[in-house]
Amino acid sequence: MESQSKKSSALKTLSSLWNGSSSATSDPVTVLDRSRTHHHRGRSTSSKAQPFRLDDSVYSDQPPKDHISLARSITRPESASESKIYAPSARSSLSLEAVVGKKVSAKFAKYLSQTDDDWGVSNIKASKSLPRMARSTTPNSSSRSLFPQNGVDTTTSRQKLHSSGRFPLPAKLAHRSVEVEVAESNALVSRIKKFSRILDAPIVDLNALRTLAWNGIPSEHRPIVWKYLLGYLPCNASRREVTLKRKRDEYNAAKDSCFNTNTEPPPLDQTIWRQIVLDVPRTNPSILLYQNPLTQRMLERILYVWASRHPASGYVQGISDLVTPFIQVFLSEYIGDKDPMTYDIALLDETNRNDIEADAYWCLSKLLDGIQDNYIHAQPGIRRQVNNLRELTLRIDEPLVKHLQMEGVDFLQFSFRWMNCLLMRELSISNIIRMWDTYMAEGVQGFSEFHLYVCAAFLVKWSSELQKMEFQDILIFLQSIPTKDWSTKDIEILLSEAFLWKSLYSGAGAHLKR
């Protein structure tokens, strides 16, 4: 009944927009979509927590100064798999036809037909009197032509009704239209050209690069873009080669001083070395690249040199995980289209391997400079992050936090690893690399502050499942969260939700206030 009343209200809004107030917005469906944005993916609809009122600025088409625009990807589904969040029930769709009937105006009937895909009801057979609308050639565009093309239905990949007579929610279609594939290919080419224009400039516009990188970096540009975003390379083109050579030589000298010596290292160094040697073989054991002896020796040297040059923290378990995305990304710069995860690094000459090792060391150092409190004695940075995660989650999903407290689950028991390893044990390395594109685009706070909001969105995603579990099941679930089949799209949705929470709560510790 509640869904039918919401649908009736939505129809009244649509009717009023069509008959006289449509000039208020260029896309009336967006108004309805905004009213439904509190149904985030993974959130329990039965939660009693009151949703927060969002500022219009959060949903405007103009991006924040320091971020790429996420409003369109947040307020409207971009694919068939996402549109199920917004799809009404079959019963409400059928009642729609009964109410409208023959009395509906021709214009409004056409409008309903043109928006059927946005509401996820494209699989409902339309009345013969209503012409079908032609899709826009842009895959994610909400606009439709108001007239059929020669009376022929140009909409492709329509789902057939289930044999049971029900109207299933849209699923990923087995066959995609040629138009969509061509449009996506053109969009990728256009995006690559935008990166190339920025990177080929005499002085790289770092703000423009961050804005563009927020939504992901093409694999062919990722190695150099990461180096810019982390501050490893200077923006001035005339200084790049000189700086790169100097930094690589500096690392090689530090490496030689640590490993090419006839004197016995002090006991503390031996302790660090033994721990590193134990941890490296356990790093990404299922990926061939990291089981290669040459890669393992590379990891050992990077970790030991970093620990020796940062005595306040030394080596802490978990840092070994943070090196691997850099090695994988920088390796891809030398092997073309081959898969870095299965590539035999022995095929590279020693000079290229040394360059990859040096670049990975310096980028790891830049990353850890922003979160070094996580790895000093007693790891106060991680404990502070865990406490902030608890308070933030309490604001977002109070029933979930109360359930965890009632079951005796402490946030430290499961989220310590999230902060220590930056979710690398919870997500595949390919998804981590995509997530790091956004972290680096966020700037110096990407791996600390923004990561906190990603962890909150990640936890709240499983709220409905967790609230049905008891203590032991909760801990088992949170130690092995089912993300094996996650794609890049899942990561982008997670990042979008984290951006929303950050827009609401960042600054002045707002999320800590009750």
UniProtKB/Swiss-Prot annotation:
Residues 216-443 form the Rab-GAP TBC domain. Residues 18-28, 135-158 have a biased composition (Polar residues). GO terms for molecular function: GTPase activator activity. The gene is gyp1. One of its GO terms (biological process) is vesicle-mediated transport. Disulfide bonds: none annotated. Keywords: Cytoplasm, Golgi apparatus, GTPase activation, Nucleus. This is GTPase-activating protein gyp1. It comes from Schizosaccharomyces pombe (strain 972 / ATCC 24843). Stimulates specifically the GTPase activity of ypt1. Functions on the Golgi as a negative regulator of ypt1. It is found in: Golgi apparatus, Golgi stack; Cytoplasm; Nucleus. GO terms for cellular component: cytoplasm; cytosol; Golgi apparatus; Golgi stack; nucleus. Residues 17-65, 130-164 are annotated as: Disordered. It comes from the Eukaryota.
